[in-house]
């Protein structure tokens, strides 16, 4: 595979069908949104959660890079509340949610849920209230940035609304607690359909359903049954079922064994971070949450890093690449490709890298270098 083709496959989307990126040289997984703009000169209204810790700094990097790339965007900045909103049972407010529902698209920096009882986590609230049913995380090697593996190119698709993360825990008796795992046919069919349609749309050859049905025969058994049913509709795509522990071993031994992985919530949380480690960490990994009614929320999945907050040391790559995914979703393919190439070239050159990438550049210098490549 040539370097041009190698990079093209990693560009996050390139088409304009119901799921973006229908050409063979793209990998854009996101459901299209019907919006009232058709050119790069029409302002886009998008929700922005700068987030906590380093969030505001890396959000500022995104703003600067988007401006340099002539992305005309009107950010609706949202900040979580200082008290629990009774309508959401979270520090995430009702107005925060309404912003995303209205704009249909958004970008989220890292959020830190305040410690304490009696309220839901911020991320869980977003997923539940906005029905963000699929988390799509491309995991690919960045040319010029050396890691333990070369040419990693896979996609994790995580069911995002149920499983062990249903919030159903209680104490049975003193010293004994119980947590309920919820798997439904509706949610499993929905994410399975998305995974196979994604694979077909983007020229992917294989879908792996990750499970532990050998032990959890009812819950994971239902998930697998749904994947089996959907797989039967796509005979051109190779389908396999892989036990979660074996999947972890296979990923570490040879990531090239996988293409598209679809899995329940908890497994997706774990496997997607494992895959990020194959290519350099969460600081290099973009992510997009897909919801019904055309909602898409891109996010940086790393932590808020309060220890370096305000020190101009943060790496904005993950949020920038997630922003690229958002632009692809909005069919702003030209600007998305320009920004993606500028990020890749900056990292590959090696002159300007933040400390986590082995360099000594500040957030400001790294961002400026990306803008200069534009």
From Swiss-Prot:
This is Isocitrate dehydrogenase [NAD] catalytic subunit 6, mitochondrial. Keywords: Magnesium, Manganese, Metal-binding, Mitochondrion, NAD, Oxidoreductase, Transit peptide, Tricarboxylic acid cycle. GO terms for cellular component: cytosol; mitochondrion. It comes from Arabidopsis thaliana (Mouse-ear cress). Its EC number is 1.1.1.41. It catalyses: D-threo-isocitrate + NAD(+) = 2-oxoglutarate + CO2 + NADH. GO terms for molecular function: isocitrate dehydrogenase (NAD+) activity; magnesium ion binding; NAD binding. Pfam families: Iso_dh (PF00180). Its cofactor is Mg(2+); Mn(2+).
């Amino acid at each position: 595979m040539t370097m041009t083709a190698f990079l093209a496959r990693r560009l996050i989307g390139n088409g304009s069908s119901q799921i973006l990126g229908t050409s063979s040289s793209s990998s854009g997984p996101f459901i299209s949104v019907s919006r009232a703009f058709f050119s790069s000169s029409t302002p886009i209204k998008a929700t922005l959660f700068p987030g906590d810790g380093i969030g505001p700094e890396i959000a500022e990097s995104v703003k600067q890079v988007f401006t340099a790339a002539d992305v005309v965007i009107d950010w609706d900045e949202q900040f979580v509340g200082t008290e629990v909103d009774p309508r959401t049972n979270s520090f995430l407010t009702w107005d925060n949610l309404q912003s995303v529902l209205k704009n249909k698209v958004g970008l989220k920096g890292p959020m830190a849920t305040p410690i304490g009882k009696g309220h839901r986590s911020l991320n869980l609230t977003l997923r539940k209230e906005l029905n963000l049913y699929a988390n799509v995380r491309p995991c690919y090697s960045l040319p010029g940035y050396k890691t333990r593996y070369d040419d990693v190119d896979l996609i994790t698709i995580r069911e995002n609304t149920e499983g062990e993360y249903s919030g159903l825990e209680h104490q049975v008796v003193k010293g004994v607690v119980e947590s309920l795992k919820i798997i439904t046919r509706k949610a499993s069919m929905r994410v399975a359909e998305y995974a196979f349609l994604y694979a077909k749309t983007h020229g992917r050859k294989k879908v792996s359903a990750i499970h532990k049905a050998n032990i959890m025969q009812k819950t994971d058994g239902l998930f697998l049954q749904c994947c089996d049913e959907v797989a039967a509709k796509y005979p051109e795509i190779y389908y396999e079922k892989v036990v979660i522990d074996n999947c972890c071993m296979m990923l570490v031994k040879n990531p090239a064994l996988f293409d598209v992985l679809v899995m329940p919530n908890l497994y997706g949380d774990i496997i997607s971070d494992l895959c990020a480690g194959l290519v350099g960490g969460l600081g290099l990994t973009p992510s997009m949450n897909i919801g019904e009614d055309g909602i898409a929320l891109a996010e940086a999945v790393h932590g808020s890093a309060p220890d370096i907050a305000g020190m101009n040391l943060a790496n904005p790559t993950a949020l920038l690449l997630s922003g690229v995914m958002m632009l692809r979703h909005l069919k702003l393919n030209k600007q998305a490709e320009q920004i993606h190439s500028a990020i890749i070239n900056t990292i590959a050159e090696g002159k300007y890298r933040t400390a986590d990438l082995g360099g000594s550049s500040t957030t400001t210098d790294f961002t400026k270098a990306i803008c200069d490549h534009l």
